[in-house]
UniProtKB/Swiss-Prot annotation:
Pfam families per record: Arrestin_C, Arrestin_N, C2
Top-level taxon of origin: Eukaryota
Family per similarity comment: Belongs to the arrestin family.
Molecular functions (GO terms): cAMP-dependent protein kinase regulator activity; identical protein binding; phosphatidylcholine binding; phosphatidylserine binding
Coiled coil: 616-647
Protein name: Arrestin domain-containing protein C
Domain C2: 1-105
Keywords: Coiled coil
SUPFAM superfamilies with a match to the protein in the record: C2 domain (Calcium/lipid-binding domain, CaLB), E set domains, SAM/Pointed domain
GO BP terms: aggregation involved in sorocarp development; G protein-coupled receptor internalization; protein transport; regulation of adenylate cyclase-activating G protein-coupled receptor signaling pathway
Gene Ontology CC entries for this record: cytoplasm; cytosol; plasma membrane
Amino acid sequence: MTQRSLKINIIEGKDLKGLDSGGVSDCYVKFKCGPISAKTEVIKKSTSPIWNYMINIGNVEENTLLQFECFDWERIGNNRTMGKTQAFVSDLSSGAKRNLMDQWLRLDTKGFIRISYEFTPPYPLETESTNSPNLSVVGNGSSSSSSLMYNPTPVYFKPIFLPTIPSETINNNKSTTCHFLIPGSVYQTRPFVCGEFVNCSLVLNVFEARIVVRSLNLSFSGSITYKGKKQRKLVNDYRDLLLGFTGGVPVPNNNGNNNLTSNKVVLERGKHVFPFQFFIDKTCKSTVNLTDYKVNYYLSFHADIVNQPDISASQEIKVVNLEDTVYKQTISPINAQTSKSPLTGGNISISCKSVKNSFYPGEEIELEVEVNNSSKKKIKNVDIQLNKVEYDGTDVTGTSYQLLTMTKKFYPKIKQNTACKQMVVIELPSTTQCVGLIHSIAETKMIRVEYHLLVNLDIPSCVDLRLKLPITIVQPDPKFETLPNPLTEIGNLPRYVKDWSIKNFHSWVLFKKQCPDVMALNPEFYQYNLSGSDLMQLPTETLYSIFKGAGPRTQELVNDLQSQIFEIKLVRNFLKELQLSNLIDYFEKQTITWDILLQLNYNEIFSITDITIGDAKRIFLKIQQIQSERQKQQEQQEQQVVSNLEAVSLQKSE
């Protein structure tokens, strides 16, 4: 076996515990590997310190243990531990064989430590397909190969910059804001499918002239929680969105280390859109929120800003495994029957049939009910209940919940020596109508969720006849999108473009202009996340990029939108020219565009707001001047046309 030496560089920490006042700590790391121990410098008042501390360990074996412990330095008293973690050299060598030379180590309390490493001589790279995963994060505590999470090679996208934030602040807010942008979620909540990529964006709105950032850390996590305790991590991946500026290649700092976070990046005033991508393994579970059993997935973001307070954002996303949907539903028919003999004699039987036993929320269950009555009873109706039963852990007796009850009457009534076959339609509630209607679950030693229909034949003056029909609830097609009513959306479009919401802009494209290709053929469209106030400030070339999916209709859409924008801007410029900028808001509240402005008389202008007589008169005189100039131009154009016609007729006569 080849003997190899190892160098470790403790680069940085992230999301560490803040033990001092202000939620920060004076952070340093103690390292131990056999007889070798080392300590980094203390970085004060931080939860994301940068150390860049190099340690030459020397020769190591695959089973050599590396120990890291993070401390909060105290001037007086004992230093306080902030968490620890450990990893075997085999964990690092497996990454080196895949050309991965740095890893995040998860502390056993909160936060992470990032290290890089170098083996001498280096390991030969393993041959693997492009889909082969790379080592991303090492687990905490008793680290072993089984606690490692493997994620596909990170893909970084170039950020999009839109200079859309006006010089004046919005709602007197000068702080930088951020939020997640989920594609396809304008009209409804969009779920993500296991085995596919999560393609989203992080939107950073900068209101100051510029901000300076050290890092834009993004994480994607998912876990199973049972009775308040995490049972299993389903996904755990990380990105620094600043790597999008370099295509994912770390930038060497002054010390020669590949560490982008030590290089500050300036972000100008405007909207910065950072597209990102994570992968959900096909073995992950669907999102569930029960009292004792939860499967949750979160996107979390933290921006380390130099000249402003740091900002954070978190959003839960819905994940669906196709095994829990209509794509994997079983086509097992329902066929059950039972009978009884009343004391008064005769027999009553009931049978229920359906072509399948799997249904999704909102679907109609078509149940064929057949009743044969040879007794003296007169049967009028049948009662149907939908029950959900939750089994906790290994319990055999579950807790039952009634989700739906209904009564169906027989027409005509089933009298003695008669039979009736009737199709009963049971309308399952949607998930919005009944939050408790989740898909059927069977998680070993944790929870089991089952459903059944109780069909109760109501027999007068006798014990009712009951059938229990087990059914399976699955989730609907996760990729099916229900669009709203086009007429309603068009009717809700504000008169002013500047008042459009993001939803209004989508509705204008989809329904009013009837051009779905803008979104269908341009996957980047959703990343712009544009409202009316944004559209008012975009240059023409950006509008062409937004509408490029429209193909030959791109020019039409740009012209239509710009004409509406110009109608507003002309009114603003008109008032600014008269030094009446303070009246812009009053005019826009009355939705006065340029074409309407030129038709206003003095009384209408004066009634807009508490405008002074002098200002109203100045506006009215300016309107008259513009109308007069327009009339002169029109007369000149008419005279020019007449002159041209006379010249043509004169040439013909000659």
